UniProtKB/Swiss-Prot annotation:
Protein name: Uncharacterized protein MG443 homolog
Origin species: Mycoplasma pneumoniae (strain ATCC 29342 / M129 / Subtype 1)
Alphabetical list of InterPro entries matching this protein: DUF2179, N-reg_PII/ATP_PRibTrfase_C, UPF0750_membrane, YitT
Keyword ATP-binding tagged: no
Main location: membrane
Length: 401
């Protein structure tokens, strides 16, 4: 019987060890990327804005200006106009021609933004507009400075192969074509441009990711990239929902006009001076070029990245399990923003003791602020966050300015 007693004793000990193997651990996960930036202070905001402006200027120069692609929105108009102007001013010296091109490509966009900046100041708010204006001016001034550096007009490495295509060989033989040939969209029927077209899509994807990330961070900081973004932010804040589909159509219309100017018309003018390619001028396939498709690919990729990194109009339910229920409640009530707030009765699963928890429905972007307030009162409480697929009714939203 001793062996039986020892066996049961060992089993009991094993159970105890298994139970004691469980330990209390702190788990932290976030529904938001760059969550720390939602509460960034003013000096940090401006520092990040200028860094983003510098990065965007570089990528815009290398991945858009030099590749025949376009940005999205109003900036595409100034880009298309600058390309058309470059082709038309072929009688100017190269230095003057490039200077005029860069002024209209970069600095003219700042001028176009002036009425939109005034609109934003009156309709959206002071802080938002000032921060956005810093970005608009800085990114385009940086871009202009980069563009006038000697050698800045050199093609990216993967696109330099365009100089070895059949089209480029014929363009070099034509009189007065020179750099204007770079503004001719890639041609579907020129098999020698196959590798260059693939490279263009790669560059479009890279720029789409970088641009989407930059835009998301700007939105998180409480600013935008200017242009049509001012209108986007105004309608989004007024309607308290994303107006992406409507603005996508508006920006697409603007982009089509830009491509008509900077690629279709400008490209056709250049092709008329190249004997073997005269027939390609003013053809429909010149408009529906690889450049157009790659541009839309970049735009869609940008939108996808922004939606993932800045889910502004997504909602979540927050449950706070704390023994300091009254202190947390008062802290939330004393916050500058009004939060939806309810208290529910619960029962402990082990002790069967009655407890209470705080429940709040809020936007994703408000979660870091709520957790910060709660943690000031109770560093050890459990905060549960659940995504909400849909919502219908009134809810308190923090003022944006």
């Amino acid at each position: 019987m001793d062996w039986l007693k020892r066996w049961f004793t060992r089993k009991d000990q094993d159970k105890t060890e298994t139970t004691s193997a469980s330990k209390r651990a702190k788990i932290t996960s976030s529904l938001l990327m760059f969550s720390a930036l939602y509460e960034a202070k003013k000096p940090l905001k401006y520092t990040i804005v200028y860094i983003l402006a510098l990065v965007n200027a570089f990528f815009l120069l290398v991945f858009i200006q030099q590749t025949g692609l376009y940005s999205f929105g109003i900036s595409s108009l100034t880009q298309g106009f600058a390309r058309l102007l470059f082709v038309l001013l072929k009688n100017l010296e190269d230095g003057q021609r490039n200077l005029v091109f860069n002024i209209f490509y970069w600095l003219f966009y700042v001028i176009v933004n002036i009425p939109l900046i005034i609109f934003s100041y009156k309709k959206i708010g002071k802080r938002f507009t000032i921060l956005s204006t810093h970005y608009v001016v800085a990114s385009n001034v940086f871009g202009f400075i980069f563009s006038i550096i000697p050698g800045a007009n050199q093609l990216p490495s993967m696109l330099s192969a365009v100089h070895h295509t059949e089209f480029w060989e014929d363009a070099k033989k034509a009189e007065g074509v020179d750099q204007s040939a770079l503004f001719v969209p890639f041609l579907w029927n020129d098999t020698s441009q196959g590798n260059v077209i693939i490279s263009t899509f790669i560059y479009a994807g890279i720029y789409g990711f970088v641009n989407g990330t930059s835009l998301a961070i700007l939105y998180i900081l409480g600013s935008c990239a200017g242009g049509a973004d001012f209108l986007t932010q105004y309608f989004a804040r007024k309607k308290n929902r994303s107006v992406g589909p409507i603005l996508f159509y508006v920006n697409t219309f603007i982009l089509i006009i830009a491509i008509l100017m900077g690629s279709f018309v400008a490209g056709s003018i250049v092709l008329q001076d190249i004997p073997d390619y005269k027939k390609s001028a003013w053809q429909v396939n010149l408009f529906f070029s690889p450049n157009l498709i790659a541009t839309f690919f970049s735009v869609l990729f940008t939108g996808t990245v922004v939606s993932h990194l800045f889910p502004r109009y997504n909602f979540a339910e927050i449950k706070v399990f704390t023994d300091k229920i009254e202190e947390v409640r008062l802290a939330l009530l004393n916050d500058k923003a009004t939060h939806s707030l309810s208290i529910q009765e619960t029962m402990g699963g082990y002790s069967l003791a009655k407890k209470r928890m705080i429940v709040s429905v809020t936007m994703y972007v408000e979660i870091p602020n709520l957790i910060r307030i709660i943690r000031k009162i109770d560093k050890d409480c459990l905060v549960s966050i659940t995504r909400i697929r849909g919502i219908d009714g009134y809810i308190y939203l923090r003022s944006q300015d």
